[in-house]
Amino acid sequence: MKASGTLREYKVVGRCLPTPKSPAPPLYRMRIFAPNHVVAKSRFWYFVSQLKKMKKSSGEIVYCGQVFEKSPLRVKNFGIWLRYDSRSGTHNMYREYRDLTTAGAVTQCYRDMGARHRARAHSIQVMKVEEMAAARCRRPAVKQFHDSRIRFPLPHRVLRRQHKPRFSAKRPNTFF
């Protein structure tokens, strides 16, 4: 999978094709993060074939739809449980991100894993994504923003006063 652009969250439901032996086969639902619905269906078959004796030629996709965020204007904390294949083996990992949407947090995770661990998108498997309360967060990079009186420095302020002389004898100091 190529994690191009912002990933989207898809709900994919599939099953084995009905046979005389099992006329109503069980449905399997997955939450897939992919750039488009074609890749989402492909990832579904990849994961389902690992978990069950089921493949694309002997199955069907019942539903594939994009899941939209309930509150995309509120900043939330997300915990992501994943496994990835590195050059030395397979590792489990837990990561935390702050974002407006679940898909945004997962996209951030893919970018971060590529940058920090050189993990390609095809070798990352997101197992669980959960919205976390501020009290449950563990990573200091996320916890540093849990302050109601948070203040940010203004390192480079340019004062543009209207009636100030156009030319000055000395350069202005804009770093306070």
Swiss-Prot record:
Gene3D superfamilies registered for this protein in UniProt: 3.10.20.10
Sorted UniProt keywords: Cytoplasm, Isopeptide bond, Phosphoprotein, Ribonucleoprotein, Ribosomal protein, Ubl conjugation
UniProt GO MF annotations: structural constituent of ribosome
Crosslink site: Glycyl lysine isopeptide (Lys-Gly) (interchain with G-Cter in SUMO2): K11, K128, K170
Pfam family, one: Ribosomal_L18A
GO terms (BP aspect): translation
GO CC annotations, alphabetized: cytoplasm; ribonucleoprotein complex; ribosome
Protein location: Cytoplasm
Modification N6-succinyllysine occurs at: K76
List of residues that carry Phosphotyrosine: Y63
Function: Component of the large ribosomal subunit. The ribosome is a large ribonucleoprotein complex responsible for the synthesis of proteins in the cell.
Description of how the protein assembles with itself and partners: Component of the large ribosomal subunit. Binds IPO9 with high affinity.
Family membership noted in the UniProt record: Belongs to the eukaryotic ribosomal protein eL20 family.
Record protein name field: Large ribosomal subunit protein eL20
Gene name tied to this protein: RPL18A
